[in-house]
Regions:
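Membrane-interface junctions at the ends of membrane-embedded or membrane-associated helices
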Residues: 87-93, 170-177, 239-251, 291-308, ...
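C-terminal "closing" transmembrane helix and its immediate cytosolic amphipathic cap
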Residues: 1-14, 171, 299, 303-306, ...
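Alpha-helical transmembrane segments and their membrane-interface exit regions
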Residues: 281-291
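Alpha-helical transmembrane segments of multi-pass membrane proteins
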Residues: 33-45, 194-195
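Transmembrane alpha-helical segments and their boundary/interface "anchor" motifs
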Residues: 22-25, 29, 63, 67-70, ...
């Protein structure tokens, strides 16, 4: 298998091979985020199970799903964008296409949320930063979680996109035999950053649902510069695969490592469950799945159905909290028996998938087809050596 990977590394930096399994995995990550939010009894308060054991089991099952799902998206973003970076692309064209990819769905769900829940009561100090995708930079939970909560991660993505062309220049300069060292340094940097926040930022009073203060939660989870480690790790793992330095970890061990990381995250100090406990398994899984695609091996995530689900996963991610809030308001504090509650959770999940599909076919795909194609020029090449 190493020979297959090394053969692929002889290709130029613009790597035309698609990675359909990673598209399919995006849906799994979005489903984990849905399960996490649906299981909450506080903040969102959707968890509809009257039976305490069923409610607790639901919450424990998805207790790390939100943190892991978002971390997966950040690592995946760095990996995929590095993998597909074109040497004839321009910085402006790249950033324009990336903004075009995320902003229309953001605006649509922002407007829907404001119309349904907040137009009359949400002040401009909350809705305007959210609209402009700068709210994750503001250390107030009513701001960084305001309007449509999941949109905070788009602030991080936007920050990553702006930095990517410049990061790529330096990451491409790293000698092949030092890529693993830099990947390890990135993980150590993430751990050191979280440790410093844990030591230097007050931990009380706690937020409503978790044992962490607003300030510490903001810095350790929402603040875009401190999520850059995950994005850069994804970039480095892509370079490791492209240069033939991947260790050849198989899919089964990679998934086993991910499950172990998920369980491990349940027992580490709360703040370290956000990304420190799971970022290495996530990076290894993404690279292992990508390597399988390059080698032409089956993964179970590259089929037509999984790719369709992956295509709509961004829209699903953006609209699922709107669906959960609507159902929570309809429940109005009522709890249901286990069969009825399970049906309701599945119905909300189905509605989120449907909403994601509508966003994809009505907004995301038409916009990208109309304006999202690269317009390469022979100057200002992205990632060019300087």
């Amino acid at each position: 298998m190493n020979d297959v990977i090394r053969t692929s590394s002889a290709l130029p930096h613009y790597h035309p091979r698609k990675l359909p399994s990673l598209t399919g995995l995006r849906f799994v990550a979005a489903a984990l985020v849905f399960g996490f939010h649906a299981s909450l009894t506080k903040i969102i308060g959707f968890n509809p199970y009257a039976d305490h054991q069923a409610s607790h089991a639901f919450k424990v099952l998805f207790s790390e799903g939100g943190w892991m799902g978002v971390s997966f998206f950040f690592v995946l973003s760095g990996f995929v964008i590095t993998w597909s970076a074109r040497p004839d692309d321009t910085v402006g064209s790249f950033i324009f296409r990336r903004v075009l990819k995320i902003y229309p769905n953001h605006f649509a769900t922002w407007a829907l949320t404001m119309i349904l829940f907040g137009a009359a009561v949400t002040p401009a100090s909350i809705w305007l930063p959210n609209l402009l995708l700068v709210h994750a930079w503001i250390p107030k939970d009513e701001v960084y979680l305001g309007v449509n909560g999941p949109s905070w991660s788009l602030c991080c993505e936007l920050f990553f996109y702006v930095l990517f062309p410049f990061l790529l220049i330096y990451i491409k300069r790293i000698p092949e035999n030092r890529l693993w060292m830099w990947a390890a340094a990135t993980v150590i940097g993430l751990f050191a950053c979280q440790s410093a926040i844990n030591l230097l930022v007050r931990g009380t009073p706690w937020v409503t649902a978790w044992p962490i203060s607003v300030e510490r939660w903001w810095l350790s989870y929402f603040f875009p510069p401190f999520r850059l480690f995950e994005f850069v790790l994804g970039m480095l793992m892509a370079r490791i695969l492209m240069t033939g330095r991947w260790i050849g970890l198989g899919l089964v061990p990679a998934f086993g490592l991910l499950v172990a990381g998920y369980i491990f995250a349940m027992f580490v100090p709360f703040q370290f469950s956000f990304n420190v406990a799971t970022v290495v398994p996530i990076a290894f899984l993404i690279t292992s799945v990508a390597a399988a695609d390059v080698a032409g091996r089956r993964t179970g995530f590259a089929g037509r159905t999984m790719n369709w689900l992956g295509d709509i996963s961004f829209g699903m991610y953006m609209i699922h909290l709107v669906i959960l809030t609507l159902v929570t308001n309809w429940l109005n504090g009522r709890l249901l028996g286990t069969p009825a509650a399970t049906v309701l959770v599945l119905a909300a999940f189905g509605a989120s998938v449907l909403g994601g599909w509508l966003l994809f076919v009505c907004i995301e795909r038409p916009v990208m087809r109309r304006w999202g194609k690269a317009a390469p020029r022979k100057s200002a090449l992205m990632g060019a050596e300087v």
